[in-house]
Regions:
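Short, flexible loop segments at the rims of nucleotide/cofactor-binding pockets, characterized by
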Residues: 11-15, 63-67, 85
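Conserved beta-strand scaffold positions in the cores of enzyme catalytic domains, especially
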Residues: 61-63, 138, 172-174
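Long, largely alpha-helical accessory region at the distal end of helicase-like NTP-driven motors
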Residues: 32, 170-180
Length: 180
């Protein structure tokens, strides 16, 4: 069973309907949006490519991974700091900590984790205020692959993140979306 669960979890990042939902969400949001992913080849690159096809030049799309040199990461940060029509598709490892972009208005956890510190640091990217900004919206995409009494790991991790959001007194709303 552990092996099966792991395979299901990895397959989520390559689910076309799930990725289409994330792409449509990011494309429809107003302001700068940070899309955080875990797997570069399996998830980050497909999200980036699909976003480029979807927005067709109406927004600037940036891709950041561990292979992106620091100078280019800084350039993305500066551009996003000066403009408000960007989507940054970044790996958790590169943009979850140490990045200061007060103009981030939306964060999408495309492949969230259960780590409290990592999640709070990632949310912190959007909590930095700038003139005219009062809040940041977090879209925590969780997958319910439950079957009978079995609960998948990503759903369990989502439950743990909800506990964190409650502890931190974040206002949140759960919206169920059927993507099939």
């Amino acid at each position: 069973p552990l092996r099966r669960q792991r395979q299901m979890c990895i397959r989520d990042s390559t689910n076309d309907a799930r990725n289409k939902f994330i792409v449509n969400l990011a494309a429809d949001l107003k302001g700068n949006t940070l899309v955080l992913y875990q797997f570069v080849q399996k998830h980050g690159i497909p999200l980036y490519e699909n976003l480029n096809n979807k927005v067709d030049g109406s927004k600037d799309i940036w891709f950041v991974s561990g292979d992106t040199v620091v100078k280019d990461r800084e350039k993305v940060r500066e551009i996003a700091g000066d403009t408000d029509n960007n989507i940054i598709v970044a790996s958790f490892g590169t943009f979850s900590t140490g990045i200061n972009i007060p103009s981030i208005e939306n964060i999408i956890f495309a492949s969230p984790s259960k780590s409290k510190i990592r999640n709070l640091q990632s949310i912190g990217r959007g909590l930095r205020l700038k003139e005219g900004k009062e809040s940041c919206n977090l879209y925590d995409v969780a997958d319910d692959l439950s079957w009978k009494s079995w609960k998948n790991h990503t759903l369990k991790h989502f439950s743990e993140r909800l506990s964190i959001y409650s502890e931190e007194k974040f206002n949140y709303k759960i919206v169920e979306v059927n993507i099939n």
